[in-house]
Amino acid sequence: MGHRSHMQSVELLGEVALPDASLAVEPAPEPRRGRIRWWSIAVVGAVALAVLVGTQVVLDTRQRAADARFAAVPGVVAPMGPTVRVTWRPPDALSGLVLAGVVADGAFVGLSVADDGSQAVVAVDQRTGDVRWSTQVFGADGSRALWLDRSVAGRCALAAAHELACLVSNDFRHFDRASSPPVVRATDTRVVLVDTRDGRMVADRDAPGATSMAVLPGLAVLGAPGRGVTGQDLLTGAERWRYTPPSAGEDLSQAAFTSAIQVFAAGDLVGVTNPGWSVALLDATGELVRKPVPAVAGYRYDQATGTLALLSTTESGQVRTTIVRTGRDVDLPGTYLDVSVDDGSVPDLVLTSDVVLRAWDVRTGRARWTSDETASGPALVLGGRVYVSTMTGTVALDGRTGAIVWRSTVSPGHAPGSLATDGRTILVADQPVAGSERSELVAYGLGDGRPVWQAPLPDGIRSSTAVGRVLLGLTADGAVVLG
């Protein structure tokens, strides 16, 4: 295993002379040279083997400890090897659920829309694709089945360690137009709470008119057009507080303004946003902790780091990022760069990107370093390093100084996909920009960036991304689970 055994020199015994030849009754037997040599070499070999075995045991123990440590880091996938294959393929009814990426108890959990238009909350084993349980929330719907709107994104969120809350509705869209498909309005909207271990329905209550939901411990915050935002007891639906967003102003239609309002959870805060206009922040009691401020470029909530970033655009068209912090916000140039995996090895780090990559201390707003690299996707933070994809490859930078540790390049005419890691390597698709050439999955060593292995992705898979503990292969019409 990369270790050399060192042979020791051994002195072999020659003939042994008797003190007095007259005392010898018969000739002394010849020394058994071969046996002495064999045992000596065997002892040395055994020692060398023991050293090798002991060293390997230590290395294996360290690797298992590292695997266990990284397995506890959100976003790190299970160890991958050079034999890349499709372990299971979600049917159409489960594809949206898998891509939504809500994981509990080792399963993808969320809403599923079947071919007959019925809806259910489902748990699908991440490793095997087996449906563990399915709890129906709406029966067959012929109209929905005709147009088969399977959109379920943002409908479910974890409410506790073993509880999933979902906003379910019988509205859907007609996809018979190229743009702006008309919506069939809901006649039944409810909040359901399901035990993720067995699918048992914990609560099922009405939520008339709600179109978005944010979940905090014991609280469902619902946004409903024309009705404002209400904080309700998650189990009973009892109203705890109400928030009415400010008027749109003379330059916006109030009806259009209120119909677009959405809510989202950001740690222990709730955001109330009108996309392209403003973001307000409330705490769990409904108290306004941040008045609506312009955020015409939107917002980012990074679950890996717990960072809430509000994005705005200057008059010159440049994007700026405001990091929301208790007591003191931090205003930074550039667009907040998402971090999909963070093991905490570079504390208080925030990254922004435009024509350059910048690192900041989120506590003080001071610049740590600037790199000429231009990030093309979310970053990974592991072992004190920052890993980012660019248009030409993958770069590893020292998290403290920004110095380049290593750089890899993709094949000519190719671009890298999003970065993932199994805690041993950086996993990234080397994918063609155009044409039918096959993509490859490449595993780069975390330390030196050398390819550990590379393998063609199965037919029809162009790129890959990490969701939960699995690596997904992305196809033209959905995703498959790779192993």
Where do the language-model regions lie?
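Secretory-pathway ectodomains
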Residues: 2-483
